[in-house]
Amino acid sequence: MDSRMKVLKLFKTLHRTRQCVFQNDCRALEAARRRINEEFKKNKSECSPAKISELLKFGTDVEIVLRTSVVQGIHTDSNKLVLQARKDLLLDNIPFCDAPEKQT
C-alpha cells in the first residue's frame, strides 16, 4: 500500500476512534477533530519516506493510546463522577493491596 493510502487510512481511523472515545462530549469531540486535522495539515507537504513512516507510527501509537487508555467520565451529582468503560479499554487485572507491608 502506498503512503497516501496509509495516511488516509490513519486519518479516518483517528476520527473514528475520536468519535468512539469522546462519544456525547461535544467539546472534546471538536477539540480532537481540530487537533487531528491541524496535525495532518501541518505535515501535508512532507515528502521524505522516512519522516512519513515516523509520523504514521506516531499517529498509530496515538490511536492505540486513545482507544485503550482514555476513560470518559460524566458528572452526575456535585461530588460524583460516573466512568464509562468501553470494551477496548485496556484493563490489567493486577491485585492491589493498600495495606503497608509488614517488615520481618
UniProtKB/Swiss-Prot annotation:
Domain of life: Eukaryota
GO cellular component: mitochondrial matrix
Protein keywords: Chaperone, Mitochondrion
Cell compartment(s), UniProt: Mitochondrion matrix
BP-aspect Gene Ontology terms: mitochondrial respiratory chain complex III assembly
Pfam families per the UniProt record, alphabetical: Complex1_LYR (PF05347)
Key word Chaperone present: yes
Main location: mitochondrion
Similarity comment: Belongs to the complex I LYR family.
Function: Assembly factor required for Rieske Fe-S protein UQCRFS1 incorporation into the cytochrome b-c1 (CIII) complex. Functions as a chaperone, binding to this subunit within the mitochondrial matrix and stabilizing it prior to its translocation and insertion into the late CIII dimeric intermediate within the mitochondrial inner membrane.
Subunit structure: Interacts with UQCRFS1.
The protein, known as: Complex III assembly factor LYRM7
Species of the source: Xenopus tropicalis
Taxonomic classification: Eukaryota, Metazoa, Chordata, Craniata, Vertebrata
